Design a protein with these regions (language model features):
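Accessory interaction regions appended to the cores of large information-processing enzymes
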Residues: 1-176
Length: 176
């Protein structure tokens, strides 16, 4: 375990939202170094489907696996053919593009791409209907979640979060 203790990638966690309800996307990202306990846990998620939750590998097209290898786990149980099509189609393409955007933009070093495993947990609204908007939202949210994972979260950033806590907002919260 100490082998990965000071790794700047392994175990980094980020999240992001992009788009508008119901076609937006919420992404959680966990970055892992291949061979680490974190990577083993991510691969365990891929090997552990359960009813309605079907982990898969993000592909840019059929047979074209994204690098860094990206394991995707849906947060919303599947079963409805429309939601399945949007999750495995628009959402998957957006996630694949977002990962590659992070590499293209230098958020992740292309030289490290084969040594990194990314676990993405994706939430797709069951009432999503605009595949183009879903793909765009997943692309933007994935890139942003990866950037959040590798970004600096120093004491100043934490103080800013604390200061903003009373202005918290969520598109699904309708209360006061």
């Amino acid at each position: 375990v100490t082998l990965f203790a000071n790794d700047p990638i392994d175990g980094r966690i980020g999240e992001a939202w992009s788009g508008e309800v119901p076609n937006g996307s919420h992404i959680n990202a966990v970055l892992a170094r291949r061979g680490s306990p974190t990577a083993a846990a991510a691969v365990g998620a891929l090997a552990s489907p359960r009813p309605g939750i079907l982990p898969y590998l993000a592909c840019l097209s059929a047979g074209t696996l994204v690098r860094p290898v990206t394991i995707v786990v849906n947060k919303v149980p599947l079963g409805d053919p429309r939601l399945e099509r949007i999750t495995w189609g628009a959402s998957q393409l957006g996630i694949a593009q977002g990962v590659l955007d992070a590499v293209a933009d230098g958020v992740l070093d292309p030289a490290d791409a084969d040594e990194i495993v990314i676990l993405i947990a994706v939430w797709v609204d069951p009432s999503a209907h605009d595949e183009t908007a879903v793909k765009r939202a997943n692309r933007e949210a994935t890139r942003a979640a990866i950037a959040d994972a590798v970004g600096s979260h120093d004491a100043g950033a934490i103080r800013a979060l604390v200061a903003a806590r009373e202005q918290a907002a969520n598109g699904y919260y309708g209360g006061e």
